[in-house]
Amino acid sequence: MSDVLPIILSGGSGTRLWPLSRETYPKQFLPLVGEHSMLQATWLRSAPVAAHAPIVVANEEHRFMAAEQLQQLGVKPSAILLEPKGRNTAPAIAVAALEATRNGGDPLLLVLPSDHVIRDEAAFQAAVTVAAAAAEQGKLVTFGIKPTAPETGYGYIKAGAGTGATAVERFVEKPDLATAQGYLASGEYYWNSGMFLFRASRYLEELRKFQPAIADACQKAWEGGKRDADFTRLDKDAFASSPSDSIDYAVMEKTADAVVVPLDAGWNDVGSWSSLLDVSEQDGQGNAHHGDVIQLDCKNTYAYGSRLIAMVGLENVVVVETDDAVLVGHRDRIQEVKEVVSQIKSAGRSEATWHRKVYRPWGAYDSIDMGQRFQVKRITVKPGATLSLQMHHHRAEHWIVVSGTAEVTRGDEVLLLTENQSTYIPLGVTHRLKNPGKLPLELIEVQSGSYLGEDDIVRFEDTYGRT
């Protein structure tokens, strides 16, 4: 389609899908429905209508995951813009629009959250075609989801008369149940999907008109950003000075050119484990299970795990198992998992933020055992990848190669280790690990010392800009 540029919004922590989704590995990077992550699925459904590779707006912490997941699809993004701090959707889209026009172009921006499920991709693409025609005429298009129930968790859009792209009469906040029932019965209202399409210049024009403080802060943040490798780091102070506002409040509710295009395509924003059950393939009793699950006489249950889960006589129950946490809850109250996450944070525990397995740009590590003055990790290093040149003040390390080849820098020495060989890194000695081979390197690391936290790392050189 002519000049459509997807803008994929990939911020957010997805705490309502804890323990699978956590701050350092949120839901948009997980394959919750199908084989691809939600970020990957967002690009794949938009690719047939796109004339450009996407611009991704992401959290600094998630930059390598976003780049790698698109790379797995053979896609090099037009840009990856890194937010130093979340400021809601209006600023995020503003910096994306500035980036989209930096070389003199003025594409149609297809703004897509990275964590939605859309079952009927053909219907979605047809709606984008209708929206693009309206955007070509200077309209700012939002996609309205045809409601299937009187949901109170969504905002609503009242549409004007007509078919195709029709004028937005008003945006409505999340209603109470009686009001939502009236909206559903009237046939005049749609759920607000959070997806948009408009010309980049038109969005910036309307933003400057209605929210000049956001426009000015984003201009400074983008102009003062630092570009390195595949990423653009927005200026921290300038971006933080922007008011935090959604595109709905900042622009769409104020502009005279807002139109809505209906979308009936099996949309779901996957805001809870209960909604994930709704979009998952179910058996005859309404059960949806992912992983190694055995159930007897269960109804309307959802289970997700890597180890064996056995369920007997349960109804309307959600069970989610990970390496270091298990969630069990009634489907009607599963949204309260956010309170659980708050309590975990208040207790100073790491499970709200980190998985046991932590992904890094060079690979991953899994903390398989830990005790007083020791920790054992399984480390995987990608072919050709190199860890930082570093040292530790409080711990020594023993490395045992399980498979692959390791090039180890230890002080002034450079060692080449293969399967079943090992080395020792004394406390205070500079060291580096590299995989010079074509296969993944796996090793076991045994740490010992008085303090084993990840912040006991002094980096001297780093391929990934973390020094």
Curated annotation (Swiss-Prot):
The keyword Isomerase applies. GO terms for molecular function: GTP binding; mannose-1-phosphate guanylyltransferase (GTP) activity; mannose-6-phosphate isomerase activity. InterPro entries: GMPP_N, Man1P_GuaTrfase/Man6P_Isoase, Man6P_isomerase-2_C, ManC/GMP-like_b-helix, Mannose-6P_isomerase_type2, NTP_transferase_dom, Nucleotide-diphossugar_trans, RmlC-like_jellyroll. It catalyses: D-mannose 6-phosphate = D-fructose 6-phosphate; alpha-D-mannose 1-phosphate + GTP + H(+) = GDP-alpha-D-mannose + diphosphate. Keywords: Exopolysaccharide synthesis, GTP-binding, Isomerase, Lipopolysaccharide biosynthesis, Multifunctional enzyme, Nucleotide-binding, Nucleotidyltransferase, Transferase. Its EC number is 5.3.1.8, 2.7.7.13. Pathway: Nucleotide-sugar biosynthesis; GDP-alpha-D-mannose biosynthesis; GDP-alpha-D-mannose from alpha-D-mannose 1-phosphate (GTP route): step 1/1; Nucleotide-sugar biosynthesis; GDP-alpha-D-mannose biosynthesis; alpha-D-mannose 1-phosphate from D-fructose 6-phosphate: step 1/2. The keyword Transferase applies. Pfam families: ManC_GMP_beta-helix, MannoseP_isomer, NTP_transferase. Gene3D superfamilies: Jelly Rolls, Spore Coat Polysaccharide Biosynthesis Protein SpsA, Chain A. One of its GO terms (biological process) is lipopolysaccharide biosynthetic process. Belongs to the mannose-6-phosphate isomerase type 2 family. Involved in xanthan production. NCBIfam families: GMP_PMI. This is Xanthan biosynthesis protein XanB. It comes from Xanthomonas campestris pv. campestris (strain B100).
